[in-house]
Regions:
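Membrane-embedded alpha-helical bundles that constitute the cytochrome b-like, heme-associated redox core
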Residues: 1-143
């Protein structure tokens, strides 16, 4: 892996850092949107409701934390392979935790509204992709 990182072009390194910065910007904008959404006050942060928390937590998990995880080997390789691997695993674990919390809030929101679950293509595809992601994470932890 070290040889691969050493062979990276400058543009690849810049693209990795730029993707990390852009994911942070998306996270800030998502948090701003969630805190200014006036669709209810049932959440734990004032302006957030359970449905808004779902969106913000999914953004944090699948946009920010996942981007940090997949770019960690290229960005943190100067600190050594072991450090980069720890950072990589940490961000994937944060992603799993945020996605699980987001799923809790959307299920809670649907229960409070007395709506059905898994009633759209978005929910089925999301659940399928989350299951694949969790399975991959679990298999890496086990092996």
């Amino acid at each position: 892996m070290g040889e691969l990182v050493d062979q990276c072009t400058t543009s690849q390194k810049v693209a990795g850092i730029l993707s990390m910065i852009l994911s942070a910007i998306v996270m800030v904008l998502g948090f701003w949107w969630g805190s200014h959404n006036n669709s209810g006050k049932s959440g734990w942060l004032g302006g957030f409701n359970d449905c808004t928390l779902h969106a913000v937590l999914m953004l944090f998990g699948m946009c920010f934390a996942y981007t940090q995880a997949i770019t960690s080997y290229r960005v943190y390789h100067y600190f050594g392979h072991t450090f980069a691997k720890i950072i990589h695993g940490f961000w994937h674990t944060v992603c799993i935790a945020m996605v699980a919390t987001a799923l809790y809030y959307i299920i809670k929101f649907h229960n409070d509204q007395k709506w059905g679950h898994l009633s759209s293509m978005h929910s089925w595809l999301g659940l399928f992709l989350i299951c694949i992601y969790f399975q991959n994470w679990l298999l890496v932890i086990i092996s």
